Amino acid sequence: MNGASLLPAGLIDLDEVPYTVRRSRLLVRRSPQESGLLQVLRATYERDLDESILVDQLEVLDERGDRVQVGSADPVAIWCGPVAVAVTAQDTVHIGPLPAGWSVRFLLQEPDAEHELGLPTGQRRLWTHKMTVSDEAQGVIRLVARSEAAELMIRCAGPAPHRRIDEVLSATSAEASRWMARCPAVLPQRERMARLCWWVLGVNTLALGGALDDLAVVPSKRGYVGLWQWDAYFIAIGLRHGDLDLARGQLQLALSRPSEYGQLPDVLHEQGILASSDDLPETDLENLRAMSSPTLAHQRIPLTKPPLTALAVDLVDRAAGNTALAEELTDVIAASQSWWFERSWSDLVDGPAYLHPYSSGLDDSPVFDRSAIVGSPDLWAYLILQDRILETWARRQGRRDEAEHHRSRSQQMLGRLLETWHAQEGRFHAVGEHGLIREDTVLGLMPLLCDGVDPEITQGLIASLEDPDRFAAAVPVPTVALADPDFEELRMWRGPVWVNTNWLLIQGLLIQGEVSRAKALRRRTLDMVISGGGPHEYFSCVDAARPPRATTCFGWSAALFIDLAVAEAADET
C-alpha cells in the first residue's frame, strides 16, 4: 500500500525534501546528526523548525537489535524494510506493522508537556498495539513487538483517535492519489519536476487554525507557515490548472481581512494577521525599527505586499471560463488600489511608495539600503496594470464612471513612471527619500508589464536583459545586476534568481509582443528549477544551485513552474 507510483523515486530524499502529507503540520527528515535516524518536526508560524522537534533519534531495529536502514520515501510513508513510518492530518505519527521481536526506539521531546500539546487530561501521547516497553531512560523509549503486526501511534498535537496503521496508509494513499491525479499535463521532459511541484502544492495545504478555518497553501512548511498575500497570488496562478476551487480559495482568503481603508494584510496565520508594525513580535520589531525610515519614527507602519491581486484573479477567472471571482472581489481590490494612492502615498517620492521594505516582498534588496520609503518602478508598474484590469472589469460591469477613474489614474501613474526612465542605462530608477536610487536591480525592468510604453523604452529594457554585464547571467535573471557593487550571488534578493520575478518578466515580454524572448526565458526558467533539483525559494544565477539559506519545497516556485510548463506544452501542441 505504498505510494511509489505517485511520484518518481528519490524525489522525497528526506534531506532537502522531507516527508509530509496534506493538511498535516508534521514533517519527517533524516537527523542532521546521523543520517540513519529520523526526526519528526511540527511546522508553526514564526518558529524555527530546529526548535520544533517533537520526536528525535527515531529508528527501527530488527530482532537482533540491528538498525533497519531508512529506505524509500513516497507520498504515503517512509519505509524501513517492511515497516512504515507515516503521519496524518491529525498530527499523529504511526509506525508499523512490525514483525515479532522488532522494536522502535526514539526520544520524545518535552515528554512531560502533554498539556502544551492540547491533550485532554489522562490522554497519553503514546498508543501501542502488541508492543511492550523494553527500556525507558532519559526520555529515550524502546518498544518491542510481542507478536506479528505490532504498531504504535504518537500524538503530536491535540486529541486524536486511535487509528490502525493499515487504515492510515489506505486513507493517505487515497488522498494522495486523488491529488496527484489533478497534476496538469506538461511535456515529457518536464513531467518529473511537474509532479514534484504538484505534490509540494498538495502537502503545503493546511488549515491555518485559530479564526481561519479555510485551507491555505502555505509558502513552505519549512519556515513560512501562514498565508502570505503575495505568495497566495502566485500559488493561485499555478493551482488554477488543476484545482480551481483551491485557487479561488487562496485569493478569497487573502482578501478576507482588509482594513477599513482597504489595505490588505501581509500575512494571515493561526495567531491572527500581520498588517502593521503593531502585529510583530518584539524580535521582529527590533529589526523593523532598524530598517525603517526616520520619517516614520514612532509611527504605526502598515505592512502589506505588492498589488498583483487583479492579475491573479483575472487569470483564475480565465481558467474557469467565467468572471465570477472578479465580480465577487472587484470592490475589495478597488479599495486596496485606492489605499496605495491615498494611504501609501509619499510626497518624498511624489507617488505611491513602499513605506517599509517588508511591503515590497524584496526586503533585502539593496534599493532599501539607504531608504526605507521607496517609490519603486515595480510598484508603479503593478499599480498601472491593476488599474487597467479594474477598468476592464468596470466597463464589463457597466460601471462607466469607475472605469474612467481607473483609466485616468493609470495614465497619470504611467506619466510619473516615465519620468524615472534613463535611456542611457536602459532602466527605470527607483526614487527614495533622498532622490534617485542608483542600485541596478530587476525592479527597474518591471515596467515591461505596462502596455503602451514607447518601443524605444521596450528595446532599452530588452537590451538590459541581454547585457552580459547586467542581467544576462548564466542562469537568468539575477535580482541585482552582475556589475552592480551590491551584487551577491547567494544572498536573498541581492543576486539570486527567483521564479516569481522571472515569471513577471515573461509576462512583460508577452505584453510587449516579444513572444520569442518570452519563450526563451520561460524555457531557461523551467530548466533552472530542474537543474537546481526542485522548487527552491531562490537559485544561484551562476549554476542554478540552491543557496544555503534558501528554503525548499517553496510554494510559488512550484506553482509558477506548473504555470510555465503548462503554457510551454500548450504552445507545443
What are these language model-derived features?
Residues M1-Q189, R222, L227-W230, H241-G242, ...:
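Terminal accessory carbohydrate-recognition/targeting modules of carbohydrate-active enzymes
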Residues R164, V168-E175, Q189-L196, D243-S256, ...:
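Extended, well-ordered alpha-helical scaffold segments
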Residues L187-G226, A254-L255, E260-L296, W345-G375, ...:
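Extended glycan-interaction surfaces of carbohydrate-active proteins
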Residues V225-P352, W380, P496-Q512, A518, ...:
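Aromatic-rich carbohydrate-recognition surfaces in CAZymes
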